Amino acid sequence: MPMIPPALRRTQAAATPTTSSPAASSSTTATLDSQSLCALPRIRVSASTLNSIVTPVKKITSETDVEAWKASAAYSIYTLFLQRVCEACVGKPTRLPTRSTDAPVTPVDKLVSLLWELDSWTQEIEPHEKPQRFGNLAFRDWGARLEERIDSLLSDLLPSRLHAFAVELRVYLLDSFGSFTRIDYGSGHELAFFAWLCFLYRLGFFDASEEQEQDETLADIQVEERIGLDIFPLYLMVVWKLQDRYGLEPAGSHGVWGLDDFQFLPYVIGAAQLRRQSGLRPNQVIGASSHASILQTQLATRTDPASLISTTLVLPASSLVGTQVEVPLPNLYLSSLLRIHVLKRGPFHEHSPLLNDIASSVPNWLKVYFGMLKMYAAECLAKKVVVQHFAFGGVGWVWTHQAHSELPRLATPSAPVAARRHLPLGGIQGNMTSMGVPTPRITRPPATPDSFDHPLRLPPRSTPSRPSTTPSVPPLAASTRPAPKPE
């Protein structure tokens, strides 16, 4: 079983900023550049690894299993991968790749070609004309084609040295586009696709050569950037079209009190894209996305998913502080808001109160980003209704019943900073609580600005003590650069 090596937990270079972390600042101009994180553990292709391949099956059936999942190496690897992709996207615009008629050359090109092939099926498979109450049954025809052709798709995608891993990889790809039985889609399917990408990454699929590096390289960062800014937006376009074409139901949606009916990760990655600038602030993004110059002029005839993701918009001057040059456009956060405006009618604060509260209450994108990470961990990765469908195999995502004692945990407020640097998504025991999202089933206080405080915020000391000289740090694995000062 692949284990987390010491490199995952070791500080690569201790950054010692002289000022307090911008994450703890209430300034509207607080920003943070991209940070270096420790490398993901790779999967070595060896005889023992090949012998460990098994068909993934579901393992999470109880809340006890959810706790075991949160304490597992698989959880830590997934959350680190998500953070690495986010860091690679900081300050950069979305780039939706176009469909090429040329033969794909690089691994990324092959993956892009696969997604465009899947998108073409959506146009080919017509919805059933007979009125249907819960989604269109033609989506099952789409799913049947995927199940029929997935082995050939993976055979064309993977190099020969990785063909044996198709047994495990196919399960995650099949689960990435929705439930063909229930005709629905939700954040669990989004999780499956991102887990599939992480599996490919760890196998060395994206590597230029078969030599797999253990340390972070420029090539790794470039691959993560393409995953976040090219591949994931293209996947988002594919599933948005599926939702529209076949009327997919939201899977496990909180309704009006949820962040989004279908997606979550676009808000996490989108907040990372906006984290380095303060020209477009959270309290202005709702107004910008609903401005008449955008919805009625720039996007008047282009409200399809591809246009919402790829169009470089000219933001209204009233929504900006300073110039527009520093705002990365397009970005996934704004694209997701535009998608909501296209699909829903009425005042934004009524049909999307949580997004509205975040925009009006959180002072800067740095806090939005860390809050989204914390909320994703609490509302998706820690919810049985979401992760119960996640499958575990023998190589890529491995199930264990016991917690990994080697994973660092923050036990007391006096724990050293170095012990807190590698906790994915602020993974402190007892700190992965809900963001305060009320639902019909569970009554909780409404979300407040404090909900988006730093995920590693410590409780107040019960007795007076000498002020610490160690600054707080964001919940990133390891930083080689100090966090910049607020503007």
From Swiss-Prot:
Keywords: Cytoplasm, Isomerase, Nucleus, Rotamase. One of its GO terms (molecular function) is protein tyrosine phosphatase activator activity. Signal peptide: none annotated. It comes from the Eukaryota. It catalyses: [protein]-peptidylproline (omega=180) = [protein]-peptidylproline (omega=0). Residues 1-28, 426-487 are annotated as: Disordered. GO terms for biological process: mitotic spindle organization. GO terms for cellular component: cytoplasm; nucleus; protein phosphatase type 2A complex. It is found in: Cytoplasm; Nucleus. Its main location: cytoplasm. The keyword Zinc does not apply. PANTHER family: SERINE/THREONINE-PROTEIN PHOSPHATASE 2A REGULATORY SUBUNIT B, SERINE_THREONINE-PROTEIN PHOSPHATASE 2A ACTIVATOR. Belongs to the PTPA-type PPIase family. PPIases accelerate the folding of proteins. It catalyzes the cis-trans isomerization of proline imidic peptide bonds in oligopeptides. Acts as a regulatory subunit for PP2A-like phosphatases modulating their activity or substrate specificity, probably by inducing a conformational change in the catalytic subunit, a direct target of the PPIase. Can reactivate inactive phosphatase PP2A-phosphatase methylesterase complexes (PP2Ai) in presence of ATP and Mg(2+) by dissociating the inactive form from the complex. This is Serine/threonine-protein phosphatase 2A activator 1. It comes from Mycosarcoma maydis (Corn smut fungus). The gene is RRD1.
